[in-house]
Structure formats: structure tokens, C-alpha cells
């Protein structure tokens, strides 16, 4: 292959926006190992740096859009040790992300300080690596926002925002059921959870309270029993992680 033709490839890669691949191609051409590659090895050598860069850029974008607060949380730290006990088999299953295609949820339970938020953050971080559209929110902040919008005369903004949260592929809610709401708040939560379930978009959450206790902590309006039961049945369908601080 002539020098003109080989550098023409670099130009084409540049024009395709594959600058990193073009640079690697030029490095190979000017290096002593040029004749050592098979065609497949050459292609892999040129494309891999571009692919890695693309994946890293996607991860950084996903992480920024996720609004994740603790960006230091990592999956490898979420296993039974001298400080905490997990049901490790379930945690490992969650990190495979098989639950996404099945539309299953994941609840992380434990007392204050058990490490629930850390695990939820680690799953969110890995979801960003896996290129899932993710959003990490405080449960109370989410509910307050939707409740305020639902009480305004212009319901278009409320409907639009509800659809937005419903369509996020993976919604991460920290401290679920930490605040009690009126009948209107329970109605808002019911619509959100039902919509996400219908769309088969998983919701992952932390909570201090078991599903059987949610009725007591989510709201105490007697007319809300049906909606509370609907929330519990839908949201508790999936994986359960219990964290015990030792």
C-alpha cells in the first residue's frame, strides 16, 4: 500500500470524526510493527482507542445527566465485609442489569447509616457505564416538585413532568417513604409508579421501611388504601437487598 493511500485513510477517519483512530493509524504507519499485524489485528488496533474514548464520553455524559451526588461509589465495595452484611447474591444479580429487560424494580432496605444510599449510588454509576438513561433523585424532592405542579391551574407542566419521569429508563429514588403526604400526594405517586410499570421502566430505591409498613409512612388518608396497595404491589415487584451494619 502506497504512502499516499495509507495517509488518505487517516484523512477519511478524521472527516468521519474518528480523530483518535486517525492518530493511532498514523502511529502504526510510522512505527516498526506495521508489518506484524494481520488485517483483523490492524483493524482492532486502530478502532479500539476510538471506541474506548466514545464509551468514556458517553459515561461522562450519562453521569452528568443522572444528577448522581456521590460519584465515588463503586460496585466492588458493595459486598459483605467486617462493617456490613449484604445478601451478596442479589447484589451481584442487580449489577448484571438483567432486571432492566424484565422491567423489575429493586429495593434496598436497612437502618440509617447502613449504606443504602452508597449501594444505590454505585448501581447508578454502573448504569451510566452501561449507557442506561438514569436519574438519581431524593424521594421528597421529587414528590414536592410534582405535588406543587399538580396543584397549579396549568396542568400541562405537571403532565409533561410526570411523563418525563415516567420515561426515564432507570429512576433511582433515595429515602423512599421518608415523608408522609396527603391524598393528593399519594395520587401523584400512584400515577408515577403505575406509569413506569406500564412502560416497564425499573425504579430502584432505598427505604428504612419494609413494604408492609409503607401504608403507615406514605400517608394516612383512609381513602388512599387502594392507591397505597397499588404502589406497594408494583414497586415491591423485583429484587430486595437488605443491608445490615455490623
Regions found by a protein language model. Name each.
Residues 132-133, 167-171, 199-205:
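Loop/turn-to-beta-strand initiation segments
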Residues 72-97:
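N-terminal pre-Walker A segment at the start of P-loop NTPase domains
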Residues 18-70:
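Interdomain "pre-motor" coupling segment immediately N-terminal to P-loop NTPase/helicase cores
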Residues 124-137:
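Post-Walker A helix-loop "phosphate-sensing" segment adjacent to the P-loop in P-loop NTPases
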Residues 1-16, 21-22:
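Charged, compositionally biased N-terminal leader segments and the immediate start
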Residues 84-91, 134-166:
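Short glycine-rich substrate-engagement loop in P-loop NTPases that contacts/grips substrate
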Residues 102-119:
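Walker A/P-loop nucleotide-binding motif
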Amino acid at each position: 500500500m502506497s504512502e499516499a493511500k495509507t495517509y488518505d485513510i487517516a484523512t477519511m477517519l478524521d472527516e468521519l470524526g474518528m480523530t483518535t483512530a486517525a492518530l493511532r493509524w498514523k502511529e502504526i504507519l510510522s512505527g516498526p510493527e506495521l508489518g506484524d499485524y494481520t488485517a483483523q489485528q490492524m483493524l482492532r488496533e486502530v478502532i479500539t482507542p476510538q471506541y474506548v474514548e466514545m464509551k468514556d464520553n458517553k459515561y461522562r455524559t450519562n453521569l452528568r445527566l443522572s444528577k448522581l451526588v456521590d460519584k465515588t461509589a463503586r460496585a466492588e465495595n458493595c459486598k459483605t465485609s467486617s462493617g456490613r452484611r449484604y445478601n451478596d447474591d442479589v447484589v451481584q444479580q442487580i449489577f448484571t442489569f438483567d432486571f432492566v429487560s424484565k422491567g423489575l424494580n429493586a429495593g434496598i432496605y436497612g437502618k440509617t447509616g447502613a449504606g443504602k444510599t452508597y449501594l444505590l449510588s454505585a448501581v447508578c454509576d454502573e448504569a451510566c457505564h452501561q449507557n442506561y438513561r438514569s436519574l438519581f433523585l431524593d424521594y421528597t424532592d421529587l414528590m414536592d416538585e410534582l405535588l406543587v405542579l399538580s396543584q397549579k391551574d396549568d396542568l400541562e407542566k405537571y403532565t409533561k413532568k410526570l411523563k418525563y419521569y415516567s420515561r426515564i429508563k432507570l429512576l433511582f429514588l433515595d429515602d423512599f417513604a421518608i415523608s408522609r403526604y396527603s391524598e393528593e400526594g399519594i395520587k401523584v405517586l400512584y400515577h408515577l409508579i403505575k406509569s413506569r410499570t406500564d412502560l416497564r421502566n425499573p425504579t430502584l430505591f432505598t427505604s428504612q421501611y419494609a413494604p408492609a409498613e409503607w401504608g403507615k409512612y406514605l400517608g394516612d388518608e383512609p381513602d388512599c388504601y387502594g392507591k397505597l396497595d397499588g404502589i406497594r404491589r408494583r414497586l415491591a415487584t423485583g429484587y430486595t437487598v437488605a443491608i445490615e451494619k455490623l
